[in-house]
Swiss-Prot record:
One of its GO terms (biological process) is RNA splicing. Belongs to the THOC7 family. The lineage of its organism: Eukaryota, Metazoa, Chordata, Craniata, Vertebrata. It comes from Xenopus laevis. Pfam families: THOC7 (PF05615). The gene is thoc7. This is THO complex subunit 7 homolog. One of its GO terms (cellular component) is THO complex part of transcription export complex.
Amino acid sequence: MGAVTDDEVIRKRLLIDGDGAGDDRRINLLVKSFVKWCNSGSQEEGYSQYQRMLSSLSQCEYSMGKTLLVHDMNLREMENYEKIYVDIESSIAAAHEKIAECKKQILQAKRIRKNRQEYDALAKVIEQHPDRHETLKQLEALDKELKQLSHTKENAEDKLELRRKQFHVLLSTIHELQQTLENDDKLAEESQESPMETQNP
């Protein structure tokens, strides 16, 4: 399991603290304290309301700071998701290119196989005339070319198998990354709903 980032720690702490909950109540208390302070009948009462007003104002400033912090954190996450999206698009494009290349290699392997069959048939015809020196020379040349084609075919098949394995790994990685992004989105939605459920029991 990977190390927890600072953004994740901050986000969890803000969610536990109930970010956004009670902001209206704090503002209302601040307004009421201000009205009572204006209407205070004595210096002692005015000082008491003044202290309450400062306390409410401090809470509002603290809440606003948390909100701005969450906003900045969300912006960073959006930028990160956009980068991941671009990487996925690039990986998909590369996968399509590899698929096209594999198809070309398959067609080449089929042509090699067809050529080998044709050469085998021709070799059988040549073998019917073993008494001719020129025919034997042609047969040797064809046999050499056939071996080269067979070697080329084996190399192409090995390369094609390697590309298939690489493509399978790439698709698995893309699937895991998409699953991770979906899980992150679900966790983010659940985390946003949790403070609302706490505020409205």
